[in-house]
Structure formats: structure tokens, C-alpha cells
């Protein structure tokens, strides 16, 4: 009983420090501090630390590499170029631009992770719609769409979200196996997200805008040579992802190698300050992931994940549909309350403790990922990316209160989550009946 109380106390204390970040305390320090406390208290041992490090090292380093690549692309104007093309392609129609910007966000989230989409694309979209002289009421839908779509469409590939990488690594799921299960739910989520966003904001989206106010996409490019090279880098990255499975190469090695090549090339570019790019990379995530997982392992050692295993087992016993929907909403609710990274870790441990196999086990694993990817949009504390996204927006004069965020988030997230989980359920039935 004492170890259980200690494990819960250390977990909650670490979580509060991570979310609150008093005096700008790094999330890495908070999580590692919690891990040290867990070691001192005896709720984990050094063998647990080694086990955890073995689980998360690939995930975190791959994530850092993807963000490094996206930061270089941002520096050379790649994402602004893409956003301006969307605005031009919409030909002055507001709703069309709203949809196109959402589609761009979905592509960026899929290839460059949700954090890259939310933190890089949102300021570009904000600057673009302000340049079109939209008032704040008309700007709001585009900003929320950029942030919302970044998480709801970060499903299709292992590298699209740190949550995905952590879960795939824990259950030893390869890049192709993961994509084969999640690309279809991703399409469900994308379609549902755009429909829900449009229905919610339809009265606030301008019918028309002045196309002459949109600058030429080519003007956004700050280095033509690096811009041309970036297409080869992206092609190499995609080939590397798929090839990694056949050669049993960790995704982090593929992404990391390409990030290093891109960084070396960027040193010659006047548009990219490589030292600044390296400094801006989310290195704290490495220490946060290891430290937080150690703390979560303490909760597991205390037997609390067994309780969650029983709840998940009860849902699974009701059949595939109930198991899929139940697991997804459990993950979403927990993510919205205590952040999605600890949630996906705890849920993975709990799923491993259930008596499930085959299609049911797959449904639980992928529903957990979906819930942990989408659930954070319900509350501002659901993900670190959302907290940082709100902070970036406030610095650019776009303040969104937690109340406004929650009211908007819960209305948008619940139907999107349900539709995506139904998509997963249908796709798993098709896969297992046809192949």
C-alpha cells in the first residue's frame, strides 16, 4: 500500500511540474526529477530504467530528427511556399481556402509530426490571413483548424506523432505494418475533422478574399538551392522509412542520418542558422520521455495498471466494436486529464496485461493511439504541443482562453474521435476478412 501511495504521489507531482513548468522549468528536468524520486523511493529499480530506455530511445531521437528537418524547411520558406500555393489554388473562395489549409496541415502532420504542423504552420497561416486583412473573428477559424488538424491527422505513420512511435516500439510494430492499419483511419479522421470544423465555423469563414493580396509563393523561398535539395531530402526520407523495415534499421537512424545530411548542407545557406536550428530542437523531449516513462513504470510496479487492464478487458469482452470504441475513449479522456504521453505509456502497459489476442489486441493498440492523438484536443493540458501552441499564439497577439479552448475542443473532438474509431473498426474487419 505504501509503495502504491508513493508511486501515485510521484506521478502526480511530476505531471503537475511538467504541465505547470514553474519558472520555465524544463519538462526534461521535471520528468528526470520524478524518475530520481521513484528510484529513491524504491518504486522502480535500475533494471526498470534500462528497460524504459530501451523502449523510448528510438521514439524520442526519431522525433527530434523529424523536428530538425522541419525547422530547416521552415527556415528556407518551404511551408510558407506551400501555404501560399493553397491560398492561390482556392482562387479567392474562403471556404475553399479553409479546406485547403486543413489539407496542408494534415500532410505536414503526417510527414513532419503534429508538433511541426502546429508550431510551424500555424504562425504562417496566421500571418497569411492577417495579410488578407481578416478581422480577428475571421482569423480564429483558420488558427483553430491549423492546431486541431495537426493532432487529429497525426495518425498515418509511426513518425507522425511521438505517441505513435512510443506505442509502435513497445509492441514491436514495423513502419509498414503500422501504416497498413492506420492510413484508412487517418482518412476517416481527416474527412471528419474538415466536416466538423466547417460545420462549427461556417458562419465565421469569409465567403471571398482578395486574391491580389496573396503574395507569390516563389517570394517565400529564401534559398532556391536548399529548396530544390529539400525535395530530394523528403524523397529520401520516405524511401528510408519503408526500407527501414526490410533492413531492420530503427526509424531514428533513418531520420537522424537524413537530418544530419540536411544540416551539413544547410551550413552553406544564408537562410539557415544551423546552430540556432540545433538549439531549437526539442532535446528536452529525450529526457522527458525516459524520465516520465520511469515514473509511469513505478505506477505499473505498484499494481495500478492492473486496474486499468481490468477495465480494458471488460470492454474487450463485449466484442470488437465495444473494445475499439471503449479503448479509444479511455485513452482520450486520460489524455485530456493527464497529458497524452503518460497516457499512451500507461495504456500500453495495461493492454499488455489483458488476455487479448489477434484482431482484438490490434484494435486495442491502435485505438489507444487514436485516443491519445485526438484526446489532447479536448483540453489545453492534453499535450505539450498544445500548451506551446497557445504560448506562441499569445506572443503573436492571438489570445485563446482555456475556457474558449475547452468549449471548442470538446465539441470538435468527440464526433471526430468517434468517426475515426469506427473507421478503425471497419478497416480491421476488412483486413482480417480479406487477407
Swiss-Prot record:
Membrane topology listed for this record: Multi-pass membrane protein
Pfam families for this protein: ArsB
Q: Which PANTHER family match?
A: TRANSPORTER ARSB-RELATED
**Keyword S-adenosyl-L-methionine part of the UniProt annotation:** no
Q: Where in the cell is it found?
A: Cell membrane
The coding gene here is: ydfA
Q: What protein is this chain from? A: Putative arsenical pump membrane protein YdfA
Superkingdom in the source lineage = Bacteria
Q: Name one GO biological process term.
A: response to arsenic-containing substance
User: Which cysteine pairs make disulfide bonds?
Assistant: none
Keywords attached to this entry: Arsenical resistance, Cell membrane, Membrane, Transmembrane, Transmembrane helix
Instruction: Give start-end ranges for the coiled-coil region(s).
Output: none
Amino acid at each position: 500500500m505504501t509503495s502504491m501511495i508513493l508511486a501515485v504521489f510521484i506521478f502526480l507531482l511530476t505531471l503537475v511540474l511538467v504541465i505547470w513548468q514553474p519558472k520555465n522549468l524544463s519538462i526534461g528536468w521535471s520528468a528526470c526529477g520524478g524518475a530520481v524520486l521513484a528510484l529513491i523511493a524504491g518504486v522502480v529499480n535500475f533494471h526498470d530504467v534500462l528497460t524504459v530506455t530501451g523502449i523510448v530511445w528510438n521514439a524520442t531521437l526519431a522525433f527530434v530528427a523529424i523536428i530538425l528537418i522541419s525547422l530547416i524547411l521552415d527556415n528556407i520558406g518551404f511551408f510558407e511556399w506551400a501555404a501560399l500555393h493553397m491560398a492561390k489554388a482556392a482562387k479567392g473562395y474562403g471556404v475553399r481556402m479553409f479546406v485547403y489549409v486543413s489539407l496542408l496541415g494534415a500532410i505536414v502532420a503526417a510527414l513532419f509530426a503534429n508538433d511541426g504542423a502546429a508550431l510551424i504552420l500555424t504562425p504562417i497561416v496566421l500571418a497569411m490571413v492577417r495579410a488578407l486583412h481578416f478581422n480577428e473573428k475571421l482569423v480564429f477559424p483558420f488558427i483553430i483548424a491549423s492546431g486541431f488538424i495537426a493532432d487529429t491527422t497525426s495518425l498515418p505513420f509511426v513518425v507522425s506523432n511521438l505517441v505513435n512511435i512510443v506505442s509502435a516500439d513497445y509492441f514491436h510494430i514495423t513502419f509498414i505494418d503500422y501504416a497498413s492499419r492506420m492510413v484508412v483511419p487517418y482518412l476517416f479522421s481527416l474527412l471528419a475533422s474538415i466536416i466538423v470544423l466547417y460545420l462549427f465555423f461556417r458562419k465565421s469563414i469569409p465567403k471571398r478574399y482578395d486574391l491580389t493580396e496573396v503574395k507569390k509563393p516563389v517570394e517565400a523561398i529564401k534559398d532556391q538551392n536548399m529548396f530544390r535539395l529539400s525535395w530530394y531530402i523528403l524523397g529520401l526520407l520516405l524511401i528510408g522509412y519503408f526500407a527501414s523495415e526490410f533492413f531492420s534499421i530503427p526509424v531514428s537512424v533513418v531520420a537522424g542520418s537524413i537530418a544530419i545530411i540536411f544540416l551539413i548542407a544547410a551550413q552553406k545557406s544564408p537562410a539557415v542558422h544551423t546552430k540556432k536550428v540545433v538549439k531549437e530542437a526539442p532535446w528536452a523531449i529525450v529526457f522527458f520521455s525516459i524520465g516520465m516513462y520511469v515514473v509511469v513504470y513505478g505506477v505499473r510496479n505498484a499494481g495500478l495498471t492492473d486496474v486499468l487492464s481490468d477495465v480494458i478487458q471488460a470492454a474487450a469482452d463485449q466484442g470488437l466494436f465495444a473494445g475499439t470504441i471503449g479503448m479509444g475513449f479511455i485513452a482520450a479522456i486520460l489524455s485530456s486529464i493527464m497529458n497524452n504521453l503518460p497516457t499512451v505509456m500507461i495504456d500500453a502497459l495495461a493492454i499488455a496485461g489483458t488476455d487479448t489476442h489477434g484482431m482484438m489486441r490490434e484494435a486495442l493498440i491502435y485505438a489507444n493511439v487514436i485516443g491519445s492523438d485526438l484526446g489532447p484536443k479536448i483540453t489545453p493540458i492534453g499535450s505539450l504541443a498544445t500548451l506551446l501552441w497557445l504560448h506562441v499564439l499569445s506572443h503573436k497577439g492571438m489570445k485563446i482562453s482555456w475556457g474558449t479552448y475547452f468549449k471548442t475542443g470538446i465539441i470538435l473532438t468527440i464526433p471526430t474521435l468517434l468517426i475515426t474509431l469506427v473507421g478503425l473498426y471497419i478497416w480491421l474487419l476488412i483486413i482480417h476478412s480479406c487477407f
